[in-house]
Amino acid sequence: MTNVVVSGEQLQEAFREVAVMVDSTVAITAGPRGKTVGINKPYGAPEITKDGYKVMKGIKPEKPLHAAITSIFAQSCFQCNDKVGDGTTTCSILTSNMIMEALKSIAAGNDRVSIKNGMQKAKDAVLEGITSMSRTIPLEKMDEVAQVAIISANGDKDIGNSIADAVKKVGKEGVITVEESKGSKELEVELTTGMQFDRGYLSPYFITSNEKMIVEFDDPYLLITEKKLSIIQPLLPILEAVVKSGKPLLIIAEDIEGEALSTLVINKLRGGLKVTAVKAPGFGDRRKEMLEDIAALTGAKYVIKDELGIKMEDLTLEDLGTAKNVKVTKDNTTIVSGSSDSDRVKARVEQIKSQIETSTSDYDKEKLRERLAKLSGGVAVLKVGGVTEVEVKERRDRVEDALHATRAAIEEGIVPGGGVALLYASSALDKLKGGSDEEQIGINIIKKVLSAPIKRLVKNAGLESAVIIDHLTKQNDKELIYNVEAMNYANAFTAGVIDPAKVVRIAFETAISVASVLITTESMIVDVPNKEENASSSMGAGGMGGMNGF
């Protein structure tokens, strides 16, 4: 490999080519009338999908420079998907159009930094416009919750209604998780015991799914302790017992570090022990109480602590807690269907209620209510089934995306869908003035690009966007949308064409962030194969040739 510096017009042209490629490949999947894209796989038949996230992942240009630029696009859009589970297609449409418009102005001799500053100045005004259109979803309006999920699940009403049912069962703050079902029933909702707390895995090496970046265990044991674990020796007897049982293990401790953590990681990587470790939730006395809650919920005989005089070396499997399923992300741990002692849980619930009544601190009362909700609220499990493994996986992906979008809608409310939220938010820029003519160009770029999502939705439906956009902007009704599926104008909330405000916001913020970075990048250093590597590649590939150029 040889390092090559690419800059100037050559780099700008590469940015433009990648932006055009992304816009023409990912954007065609947008909306109910979006088209599918085939993605070639290293093995098996190509995957046919209209999921913008999968299409973005599938774009792998041959030229090293284009591949590097595409990876910047992709990572930014993936961040959008990670945060809200949706919005990848909208993000890619906005990003590519911002870059294409900005490059035109830069080619005309305008200062790229000033253009970027104007774009950033426009950002705050647009975000205020999105917020002003947002309306909260009352818990009793399950039809709106369902509609958000239906749209995110590509129109699947069963998914939308099931998610609405799950939200109704556990409330807006409740825990909802997704798992695969062994039965053939496509989707069902089950309410079970469980808990979620805000602590993630202590090492990414514990991850069991690289695609989703999570740890997921079925039927695990749980070792719960107040102690800080730094030496592996005391843990060896119980770890050996867990290995013999064939089950995975979740360790919850004050902290796990040094030799203890490194040994667990090494054993996991070697395949000898299915294990993950997280820090205990809370702080001080509250942490102790939360660990007791988890022990009660999972049927653990006790929380291991110095006061009990119990040695780690003497632990048996009967002392540990168990659960039906645990999921650990980098931020959260969810325990589903712990083998709880119902009397023990009830006793703790009553104890917490009593503490709430006697507490004189509003802060303490709030934390006690949080513990009460975790103990008594339970977990709604969306069980996804199907005839084949491929069908189950595809359906589960859609359920998880729809669930993310629904949570986003509950968190920040909903806005009119069909691309009009961004179109209407652009009116906030009508009177915004830049500090210079070039800053004003940046503001005008954002104003123009905010119509790109609706233009693409309409184009994918085979219609002309100019007339539709003109009609929408002249009505002075920010709830009016064009329904590309029904081919008519309608009220967004009546027709159920709505988007989570958070998804729209994150997609816009992410797009303007990556566009600002790319348009102000003057040079890039890329690795390109040297002549010897190209020759070797050509011989090894039966004369098909290696990568040439940037």
UniProtKB/Swiss-Prot annotation:
It is an enzyme of class 5 (isomerase). The keyword Cytoplasm applies. One of its GO terms (cellular component) is cytoplasm. Disulfide bonds: none annotated. Pfam families: Cpn60_TCP1. InterPro entries: Chaperonin_Cpn60_CS, Cpn60/GroEL, Cpn60/GroEL/TCP-1, GroEL-like_apical_dom_sf, GROEL-like_equatorial_sf, TCP-1-like_intermed_sf. It is found in: Cytoplasm. The lineage of its organism: Bacteria, Pseudomonadati, Pseudomonadota, Alphaproteobacteria, Rickettsiales. It comes from Wolbachia sp. subsp. Brugia malayi (strain TRS). Keywords: ATP-binding, Chaperone, Cytoplasm, Isomerase, Nucleotide-binding. ATP binds at T29, A30, G31, P32, K50, D86, G87, T88, T89, T90, G418, D499. This is Chaperonin GroEL. Belongs to the chaperonin (HSP60) family.
